[in-house]
């Protein structure tokens, strides 16, 4: 039995025993905190970690030396002082996460894609496989492609299971039913899908909402660290709009599983359009791709949309996104009116999301801006509606369309690496 008193990890044994906290639990917590600091700040010295965690230097040295021996973190050299003359005393040795300690497989299943790939712990892309899908693609096609791609990625990169942290699955909410995922009180139950995948692999598995995963990827995989960045709002465009807001870089639980609630926000109460739920002028009936196409169909004609009409050879069924973009640039009056109107409504939505969640950044994902000029038009619209402050907070997602599997990677890395203090996960899940 441990004697009462403080241990080197900053805990009191008597308190720990009374409250069911084991030495291993405390060790894991401290390792988690070390990894969290390194993730947030990048290379940091032991003395700075000790100061942040309010632990002794000796305690931090013991913790970090063990993690270095295990290959989880590494020393990367001395701290370079900006001033010419460095202060006297012991030099600061910087440590950082060894982002090649293990590799991660990510799988993201969304309405138009199955994306499978391999990354480092920092989200650097090493390999990928993508399959375009639509509403007719069945479960077997998705499952078979996923299994084949995982095996190919492991084989092509000569990786055994000891090199892999685990597999993260990011599933878009509208894909739940197609993959056999039931939802009760907003909570998805991944048990059936997990059981099917467990028959194919012994690797640790993580399942969650792909919107949440992509939001986390936009925090964790930033190449330039910002120690003051603690919360973002993340808006994903698609047939349904999805939203995640974070606090201290973790998703706020109440938003976690109902990411599509933003669809029901009213942004145009005087609209002629109502959606099936009965709401007038909600996001779903004003801003989604189907809403845009519905508006364009109503005005499609040789008189009102001459360029679009000619490009589509007189049939609206031939209209695609490239034609719409060209029609806008060629000054098809009705097309410009509709798209500019939607730009204003999106600005209203972004203004309201900003003031209701107070994020440091609003990150837009899957919005199809053709170029920087098109994105600037949105920022100008936001400036006009909500002011320069709100406009300055808007940025585009860092996750490329072809790398959507990084959503799954981010989910796995958080759960299996950071939340476990780097402890081996092979005996779990």
Predicted regions and their residues:
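Structured loop/turn residues at beta-strand edges in well-structured enzyme cores
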Residues: 162, 260, 357
């Amino acid at each position: 039995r441990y004697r009462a008193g403080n241990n080197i990890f900053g805990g009191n044994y008597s308190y720990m025993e009374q409250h069911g906290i084991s030495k291993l639990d405390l060790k894991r917590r401290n390792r988690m905190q070390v990894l969290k600091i390194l993730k947030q700040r990048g290379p940091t010295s032991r003395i700075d970690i000790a100061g942040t965690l309010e632990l002794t230097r000796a305690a931090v040295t013991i913790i970090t030396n063990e993690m270095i021996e295990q290959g989880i973190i590494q020393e990367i050299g001395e701290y370079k002082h900006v001033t010419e003359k460095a202060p006297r005393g012991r030099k600061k040795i910087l440590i950082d996460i060894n982002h090649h300690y293990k590799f991660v497989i990510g799988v993201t299943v969304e309405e138009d894609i199955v994306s499978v790939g391999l990354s480092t712990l920092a989200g650097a892309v090493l390999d990928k496989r993508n399959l375009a899908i639509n509403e007719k693609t069945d479960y077997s096609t998705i499952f078979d492609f996923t299994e084949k791609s995982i095996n190919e990625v492991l084989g092509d990169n000569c990786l055994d299971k000891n090199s892999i942290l685990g597999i993260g699955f990011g599933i878009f909410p509208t894909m739940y039913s197609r993959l056999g995922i039931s939802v009760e009180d907003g909570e998805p139950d991944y048990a059936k899908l997990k059981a099917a995948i467990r028959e194919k692999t012994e690797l640790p598995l993580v399942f969650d909402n792909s919107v949440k995963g992509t939001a986390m990827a936009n925090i964790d995989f930033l190449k330039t660290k910002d120690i003051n960045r603690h919360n973002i709002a993340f808006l994903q465009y698609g047939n349904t709009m999805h939203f995640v807001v974070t606090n201290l870089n973790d998703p706020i639980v109440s938003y976690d599983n109902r990411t599509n609630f933003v669809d029901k926000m009213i942004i145009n109460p005087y609209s002629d359009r109502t959606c099936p739920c009965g709401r007038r002028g909600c996001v779903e009936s004003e801003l989604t791709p189907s809403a845009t196409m519905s508006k364009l169909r109503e005005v499609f004609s040789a008189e009102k949309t001459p360029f679009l009409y000619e490009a589509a050879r007189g049939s609206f069924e031939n209209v695609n996104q490239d034609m719409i973009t060209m029609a806008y640039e060629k000054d098809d009056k009705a097309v410009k009116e509709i798209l500019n109107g939607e730009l204003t409504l999106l600005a209203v939505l972004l203004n309201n999301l900003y003031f209701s969640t107070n994020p440091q950044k609003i990150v837009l994902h899957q919005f199809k801006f053709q170029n920087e000029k098109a994105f600037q038009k949105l920022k100008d619209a936001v400036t006009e509606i909500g002011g320069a402050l709100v406009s300055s907070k808007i940025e585009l997602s860092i996750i490329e369309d072809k790398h959507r599997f990084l959503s799954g990677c981010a989910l796995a890395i958080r759960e299996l690496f950071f939340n476990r203090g780097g402890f081996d996960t092979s005996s779990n899940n």
